[in-house]
Amino acid sequence: MTQRKFPRYLHQHVKTILGREPSDEEQSLLLRWVEFDKQRRFSQILTTGEGTGAPVSLANLFRSKGSVTLDDLGEVMGRVANDLIASGVTPHMLSLYCRTPRPDKRGVRTTVNRTAKAAGDEPVSFGFTDYPFSSCIVAASSGDQISEEPSKEATDGDAVILLHSPSGEGLMTPLLQELGDVDKCIIKVRVEGTDLSTQAVRLTKLLQMGVYLNGKSLIVVGQKAFIVVCRNGSENKIRKMARKHNVSASLVGRISKDKTYRISGDDISLPLSCFSLFDSEEVVPSDIRTPDELMHQSGITLNKIKQPKSFNSTFLVILGTEECVVASQLAAALPGSSISISAKDHMVWCDPKRGAQATVAAAVRGIVSGGVAPMHAAVSVHLPERLTENVQYRFREIAEGVSTSTTAFQLSINSVRVWFSENIASPLLTVAVSGLSDSVAPELTAGFKDVGDFILMLGSHRGELGCSVYARLKLSSADGPVPMVDLAMERQMREIVLTGNKVGLIKSVIHLSAGGLAATVAHALICGGTGLGARIHVSSKIRNDELLFGETEGLTIISVAEESIIEIERLCMNSGVPCTAIGRVTDNGIFTFNDLLKVKVKKLHESQKESRKKIFG
């Protein structure tokens, strides 16, 4: 990263604070700090929670070239768990989201298989994009709610110790867990990057205390390191604990009460106020104009697509796409997961604000479909290294979309990570949502259960084809408009699903996903009992392809016993949610949809099996 020139007006401010000319070393440190602190300032735009710890956290693994190794994946999974442990949270669930180019690109299948293997029994999902990088993997971990314990305050003379584990995150985990029970341990902070001197600035700002660093101890370290502040006199105990776990522990400084940052051997002595001079700089200017590509989107031209009498062949092609294979895989995942991770890159590109809303909503649906009530969110944004006006505008819109949707769902965003990379051209958003499972309620699954059950559609099907799989296949483009996201309606549907499940009314639930209504019903059949079929009949004024393949956001399909219909309809009516009976579960092993589709369920299984083999090998 190119270091910018020290601004003249800030030079004057620093000179006024110091009562002297700042040294070259001090100016260099201040400039390194402002670049280092850029992540925090961008993150603050997205953060709504309070406190240093969070019940959900994120870590990232980015590769511009080549496939990832199992060791790489193990490190990113260990990193996200250790970050939670350091904040006082016990991790109990982990999820991975893997972005790669489409599977026909070299090395993609290797990365996909290794990611699935590394995840083991933990939930993992995949997104296939047309971006040029090799892979972008985000790990999310959730844990128990932080107990309301009074925070410990640092005092003059407390030791600053660097814990470093060159051999990997795994060695750090038991040490961090043990340090959590040490009363004399004040705070544990991850070392971000390799410049320990700038990381120490972050520590002083967190503690609002000064620090005196040993210049000879400011070694270059990797990201497998933490700074620990402990009570004066407990250094040997910490070293002994670290040695037991094969982690190096070095005393790098002391906390001081005078709120001054000093490094021995260097010409650096700065009051903490100097490091706040950049805080007034506007991170994202408010007067940036809308980029041309967002102002002039052409949308979908449906009259170019001919309407056949039967959609069987088109349906099977759609069901075999990467998007639908991943959706089916997620539908078949173990129920009751307390964490869900989502990304909708193409939607975010076409409409950053609405795409961000759709991303949050999808993460919420991911755990609601298992009967889990969403509570917390973590947000990850990858930004290009070069922050053009276009990128800044898109980030601002993403932040607005995340804010409106998390507010609507009453989620607390208490973990935000912003990363910068020279290998991407546009922001990438990833959202993880964690929640609390009701131990009394039965676990919900996606598959249809019993012959004769009614299939109900919650919400209004608008048949939107913008950003859809169908549009990509038929028009070689999946551009906007991005489907509307009705946050108020989604919140009501969430409560219906959770309440209906708690009282035993709902047998299965699946949210409309890639491929539209036809593909979603197919996923419920693939995940359902042997020999089952489905007879669907929907009256609609929209086009047949919109009805079958339109990807309306938030639409939910549930199955219920006949005796439960009246109670479910009453729940929906009281909440203002449209509820429509669209079909029944049959025993003939055939999926019919109006007179447009008639496919054996056995054929659906075969199509998915062949497509999974192409993607996963």
What is each model feature region?
Residues 73-76, 171, 196, 356-359, ...:
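Catalytic-loop motifs flanking and including active-site residues across diverse enzymes
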Residues 12, 19, 25-167, 213-219, ...:
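Glycine-rich phosphate/pyrophosphate-binding loop regions near the starts of catalytic domains
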Residues 2-29, 108-135, 176-303, 391, ...:
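Glycine-/charge-enriched secondary-structure boundary and capping motifs
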Residues 144-148, 169-175, 491-493:
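Active-site glycine-rich loop that binds ribose-phosphate moieties when present
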Residues 167, 171, 192, 489, ...:
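Short, contiguous, pocket-lining structural segments
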